[in-house]
Curated annotation (Swiss-Prot):
Family note: Belongs to the globin family.
Globin domain span: 2-146
Modified residues (N-acetylvaline): V1
Binding-site list for heme b: H63, H92
Gene: HBB
Gene Ontology MF terms: haptoglobin binding; heme binding; hemoglobin alpha binding; metal ion binding; organic acid binding; oxygen binding; oxygen carrier activity; peroxidase activity
Classification via PROSITE patterns: GLOBIN (PS01033)
Keyword Heme part of the UniProt annotation: yes
UniProt name for this protein: Hemoglobin subunit beta
Pfam families: Globin
Modified residues (S-nitrosocysteine): C93
InterPro entries assigned: Globin (IPR000971), Globin-like_sf (IPR009050), Globin/Proto (IPR012292), Hemoglobin_b (IPR002337), Hemoglobin_oxygen_transport (IPR050056)
GO cellular component terms listed in the entry, alphabetical order: blood microparticle; haptoglobin-hemoglobin complex; hemoglobin complex
Highest rank taxon of the organism: Eukaryota
Amino acid sequence: VHLTDAEKAAVSGLWSKVNVDEIGGEALGRLLVVYPWTQRFFDSFGDLSSPSAVMSNPKVKAHGKKVLNSFSEGLKHLDNLKGTFSSLSELHCDKLHVDPENFKLLGNVIVVVLAHHLGKDFTPAAQAAFQKVVAGVATALAHKYH
């Protein structure tokens, strides 16, 4: 991902304010509520029958935390996202058969959750920078698909 120095500063500065555990669960939960067809990849997570069930589901929260920790790792390697996410791309492609479009959906949900949590600090310029980052991560995760 090509970010200007100002964009990199905005991303790292705002990310330092983020509670990854909280935001991860909320982002994955919102993905499953807003795009219910994505639930098919999470059959083992138990009750996903309603928005409140999804948002309070401990397995959703735990996996969301894991997802956002990986995203956080990617922020440290913006110049090599494909390398950083290579094994996750392979897992999601070959073993889990996740539609790569879902990575874009999750990226957009992450941006919504960041806006919600960061409020006025999440300026249009900051959003533009994060949109570049989530698009880059989605592309990297889709890299192993044929």
